[in-house]
Design a protein with these regions (language model features):
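Generic short beta-strand segments
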Residues: 134-138
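Acidic, glycine-rich loop-and-strand cores that form catalytic or ligand-binding grooves
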Residues: 96-109
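A short acidic-to-branched-hydrophobic micro-motif
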Residues: 61-99
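N-terminal targeting sequences that direct proteins away from the cytosol to non-cytosolic compartments
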Residues: 1-77, 107, 111-116, 121-128, ...
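Short beta-strand/loop turn elements enriched in aromatics
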Residues: 97, 153-154
């Protein structure tokens, strides 16, 4: 059994490396318009999905590359009301809409357990106020860590969360390509 597992693992690793190289060498972007709310340029190495997150208005992923890309949008007024209800349960919430969105999202996804955050940056994306940051979580039950990159964007009447997750290290190979996608986001 051990030899077969090693062979299958080696074949899977070789397949992943070949797919990664192909994705990097044949990269193109396609603009996707979602519900006439926003547009974003998606990389060719990700494919549309519909079963990753029921709240997401845009879902793309690559199983072989172990990358998921989601956009969740919600009315700003609903989020502000939810923040007021959450202030007693989530420490550190303040007056900044985007900081609160980041805190609530990370709290809900990771439960604040054993995470490292980094690369926090206040910025603008096509004229909209935004925050970007990365999260890393070691997972003892699997050999890989969980990597996530976020962009929290304040639109006119809507807040947007761009969530990119990977259970493997392939996200490092695609970080600059995914950054192009984040920076292409525009509200319509």
């Amino acid at each position: 059994m051990g030899i077969i597992s090693a062979l299958v693992g080696g074949i899977m690793d070789a397949t992943r490396i070949a797919k990664t190289n192909k994705a990097l060498n044949e990269l193109t972007y396609e603009e996707v318009v979602v519900q006439n709310k926003y547009a974003i340029k998606m990389p060719s190495f990700l494919s549309p999905k519909s079963n990753l997150n029921e709240d997401a208005s845009l879902q793309y992923a690559s199983r072989i590359l172990d990358i998921a890309f989601l956009v969740i949008d919600e009315p700003k007024s609903e989020f502000i009301a939810a923040i007021e209800e959450s202030k007693e349960y989530i420490p550190g919430l303040g007056d900044s809409l985007l900081d609160n969105l980041a805190a609530v999202t990370i709290h809900n996804m990771f439960d604040d357990k054993d995470i490292e955050t980094g690369n926090y940056r206040q910025t603008t994306i096509n004229g909209l106020n935004a925050i970007t940051l990365n999260v890393f979580q070691e997972r003892t039950f699997l050999k890989d860590a969980l990597y996530a990159s976020f962009a929290f964007i304040e639109g006119k009447d809507t807040v947007y969360q761009i969530i990119i997750m990977s259970g493997g290290t392939s996200i490092k190979n695609f970080a600059d390509k995914l950054e192009v996608t984040i920076q292409s986001f525009r509200e319509l």
